[in-house]
């Protein structure tokens, strides 16, 4: 086998390979003999057709298979001998042999992995947020849980903020009805911003049975482009006004949250445990994101186009599956690759950087770390032992937790090298507005 390597760019290579035709012909002949043993050809008993007849029927197919295998084997043998790390898949193409009838020549164009030099981390400032969970945060969480179980009771009074109203409405712009401008038996809660402020203001103070005429100015940046910047007149029939009633924090409430004996203090303890677990998870996610961004900012790296393209394909397929699971018809929906390019580039770059840090510093996910992570995850289920056992039934199931532990170890390593700046983060900032 003869090999000639060309450098086309920093990462792109072209390898010209010549394989001995005699070896290929030997492989073809041996393969045809094996095929002949079971070949079913009209006019002959199975396996009894002459080799020439077998070659006439199967020769082209066998030759194509052998050539494909020889090209693959020849290429990967050549890159191994030259210590090249191929990124993505090579592109093969035949090369005219000319007067050389004793060789089969082909070219492989491919990219190699870049040399990764992680930027200086010593002194790199990385923010590490911290959030304290106190009694006030537990009470706030209980209030959120109460609001999620709000009951609405019909009242015979004027509608006020916080009430749920049920209405019929018809809207028109310049006297012409427009798409999405009418509905019947439409429920919403006043003051939650579900409707435009002018629309809601026209209902506040109305009673059941009232008919209100309300003028609404749609903002210029309104999501409905057909009505953005225009003025509509709505005729609104108020069909029901209901007042919100929150459940009391008592035995019944505790039972509704899964506390079988209705012990309120036990309920608070469970809520605290769940909140602390969620706060820990979100803090870890923020710290990890800060570390990853620091690594990206500190490292200049040319990315193999092949890896980015493969990652775009994965992201597109993931987006397609997510939409299908939400009941959307994605059969003819376009997924422009450029929409996923930035995310793909970031993921590829991070993957290369993390691999380099792991290899250079001999980091590993220890079995006890993996077990601790799975145990912590399993504790959020009613039968944690079953969850733990499920993971350890198959090595494949351990791959996800193992990768996560390895990432966590990279984060800890980077933090040990960098200048970590502590920052207090309020509960609301960390969790987002949930009220």
UniProtKB/Swiss-Prot annotation:
Keyword set, alphabetical order: Cell cycle, Cell division, Chaperone, Cytoplasm, Isomerase, Rotamase
Positions in coiled-coil regions: none
Gene Ontology terms, MF aspect: peptidyl-prolyl cis-trans isomerase activity; protein folding chaperone; ribosome binding
EC number: 5.2.1.8
Subcellular localization(s) per the UniProt record: Cytoplasm
GO cellular component: cytoplasm
GO biological process, alphabetically ordered: 'de novo' cotranslational protein folding; cell division; chaperone-mediated protein folding; protein transport; protein unfolding
Every PPIase FKBP-type domain range: 162-247
InterPro entries xrefs: PPIase_dom_sf, PPIase_FKBP_dom, Trig_fac, Trigger_fac_C, Trigger_fac_C_sf, Trigger_fac_ribosome-bd_bac, Trigger_fac_ribosome-bd_sf, Trigger_fact/SurA_dom_sf
Top-rank EC class of the record's enzyme: isomerase
Disulphide-bonded residues: none
Catalysed reaction equations from the record: [protein]-peptidylproline (omega=180) = [protein]-peptidylproline (omega=0)
Domains: entry comment: Consists of 3 domains; the N-terminus binds the ribosome, the middle domain has PPIase activity, while the C-terminus has intrinsic chaperone activity on its own.
Function in brief: Involved in protein export. Acts as a chaperone by maintaining the newly synthesized protein in an open conformation. Functions as a peptidyl-prolyl cis-trans isomerase.
UniProt family annotation: Belongs to the FKBP-type PPIase family. Tig subfamily.
HAMAP family in UniProt: Trigger_factor_Tig
Protein name: Trigger factor
Naturally occurring in which organism (per UniProt): Chromobacterium violaceum (strain ATCC 12472 / DSM 30191 / JCM 1249 / CCUG 213 / NBRC 12614 / NCIMB 9131 / NCTC 9757 / MK)
């Amino acid at each position: 086998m003869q090999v000639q390597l060309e450098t086309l760019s920093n990462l792109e290579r072209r390898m010209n390979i010549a394989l001995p035709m005699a070896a290929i012909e030997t492989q073809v002949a041996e393969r045809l003999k094996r095929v002949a043993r079971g070949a079913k050809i009209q006019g002959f008993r199975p396996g009894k057709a002459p080799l020439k007849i077998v070659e006439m029927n199967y020769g082209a197919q066998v030759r194509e298979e052998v050539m494909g295998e020889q090209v693959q084997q020849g290429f990967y043998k050549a890159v191994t001998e030259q210590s090249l790390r191929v990124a993505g898949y090579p592109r093969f193409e035949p090369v005219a042999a000319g007067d050389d009838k004793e060789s089969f020549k082909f070219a492989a164009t491919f990219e190699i992995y870049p040399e990764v030099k992680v930027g200086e981390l010593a002194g790199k400032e990385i923010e590490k947020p911290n959030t304290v969970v106190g009694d006030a945060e537990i009470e706030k969480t209980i209030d959120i849980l109460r609001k999620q179980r709000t009951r609405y009771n019909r009242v015979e009074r004027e509608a006020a903020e916080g009430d749920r109203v049920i209405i019929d409405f018809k809207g028109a712009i310049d006297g012409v009805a427009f798409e999405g401008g009418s509905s019947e038996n439409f429920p919403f809660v006043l003051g939650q911003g579900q409707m435009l402020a002018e629309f809601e203001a026209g209902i506040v103070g109305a009673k059941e049975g009232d008919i209100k005429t309300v003028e609404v100015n749609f903002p210029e940046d309104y999501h409905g482009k057909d009505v953005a910047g225009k003025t509509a007149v709505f005729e609104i029939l108020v069909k029901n006004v209901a007042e919100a009633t929150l459940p009391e924090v008592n035995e019944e409430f505790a039972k509704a949250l899964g506390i079988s004996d209705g012990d309120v203090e036990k309920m608070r303890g469970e809520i605290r445990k769940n909140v602390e677990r969620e706060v820990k998870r979100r803090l870890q996610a923020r710290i990890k994101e800060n570390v990853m961004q620091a690594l990206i900012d500190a490292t200049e790296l040319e990315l193999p186009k092949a890896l980015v393209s493969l990652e775009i394909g994965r992201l597109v397929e993931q987006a397609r599956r997510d939409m299908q699971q939400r009941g959307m018809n994605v059969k003819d929906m376009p997924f422009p690759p450029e929409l996923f390019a930035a995310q793909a580039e970031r993921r590829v770059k991070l993957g290369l950087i993390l691999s380099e840090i792991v290899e250079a510093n001999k980091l590993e996910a220890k079995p006890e770390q993996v077990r601790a992570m799975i145990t912590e995850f399993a504790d959020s289920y009613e039968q944690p032992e079953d969850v733990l056992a499920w993971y350890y039934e198959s090595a494949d199931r351990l791959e996800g937790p193992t990768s996560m532990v390895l990432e966590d170890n990279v984060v800890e390593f980077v933090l040990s090298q960098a200048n970590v700046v502590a920052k207090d983060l309020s509960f609301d900032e960390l969790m987002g507005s949930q009220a």
